[in-house]
Design a protein with these regions (language model features):
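Electropositive polyanion-binding surfaces
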Residues: 1-261, 286, 292
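Intrinsically disordered, low-complexity linker and terminal regions at domain boundaries
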Residues: 254-294
Length: 294
């Protein structure tokens, strides 16, 4: 796993090894604890084998050739890169001005630079949000974040339909030993265009439902913690206050402007910060705070 991972890193692959929150459920389905997700070398070993298999199958089907459904990930757009520069450069993280020079290695360097620092999680979250959403497509356009020319989802056919589509294409080639006839290939390509779009849309809906369910479970759990204090960091600065993320729980909330009672704060949108009129105290993205849940 270590060798495979470093082979990917050498070619420019981007690794988001972000810890997440695991919801521990009781017998009645209620959340009894929120703990940090455990990721060890066994998880990484399986992940590397899955990535290697996905790449190998995508490459094979492309060069057979046999129509298939690919997993594609495009470059970040200009607006998101500019937003990322505006936030990270004042913190000492450099992003080339020429967007064409911003490859996944640039983002990996930023993540590595932030490792072990107070803003590590915040910086990784920002870099992740700057990326485009990966999609399914009938054409192989490569995977930007993985620095892979060929990529498909192949390893989970029992729970993900695109993987089943890829399995069927591979099994058909193994059985026949030749690519499909031109007319059949053209018909399948047309079907894959529509199927890929639907799979991408269904994936977005499923992820949205999952996030909503987790947020609700966290809300119910935290409603019993009102009055307790938590470590948090600033995830967004707006004209009416600070959006914060509770560390360890990874739940988001708002610290409204009127809760900052020590001064009158003005919002500076270019620098994405709040500045105290009398004290000069500054609240900016990534700042760590201790907050009380109300």
């Amino acid at each position: 796993a270590f060798a495979l991972r470093w082979m990917r890193r050498d070619r420019g692959s981007l690794d988001f090894d972000l810890p997440d929150a695991d919801l521990v459920l009781g017998e009645k389905g209620d959340v009894v604890a929120i703990v940090k997700e455990v990721r060890n070398e066994a998880h990484r070993l399986i992940e590397e084998f899955m990535l290697a298999a996905n790449e190998a199958v995508a490459r094979h089907l492309l060069f057979v050739p046999s129509p298939a459904m690919y997993r594609v990930h495009d470059r970040p757009d200009e607006r998101k890169l500019n937003d990322l520069r505006a936030v990270l450069e004042p913190l000492g993280y450099d992003i080339p001005e020429d967007d064409e020079l911003v490859g996944p290695t640039v983002f990996q360097k930023i993540i590595d630079q932030a490792e072990g620092k107070p803003e590590e999680r915040f910086v990784s979250d920002l870099v992740l949000r700057a990326q485009k959403k990966a999609l399914y497509a009938a054409e192989c356009r490569g995977h930007y974040a993985l620095a892979a020319k060929y990529y498909a989802h192949f390893t989970s056919p029992i729970r993900r339909y695109p993987d089943l589509v890829v399995h069927r294409a591979l099994c058909e080639w193994i059985a026949s030993g030749r690519p499909p006839a031109a007319a059949e290939a053209e018909s399948r390509e047309r079907w894959l265009v529509d199927a890929s779009a639907q799979c991408s849309e269904r994936e977005r809906r499923a992820e949205s439902a999952e996030r909503e369910a987790q947020s609700w479970k966290k809300f119910v759990f935290l409603s019993k913690k009102v009055g307790e204090e938590f470590e948090a960091y600033v995830s967004a600065v707006v004209s009416f206050g600070l959006f914060i993320t509770l560390e360890g729980v990874y739940a988001d909330g708002l610290l409204p402007m009127d809760a900052l009672e020590d001064d009158y704060y003005r919002y500076e949108d270019v620098e994405h910060r709040l500045v105290g009129a009398s004290t000069g105290r500054v609240y900016r993205l990534g700042d760590h705070l201790r907050v009380k849940l109300t």
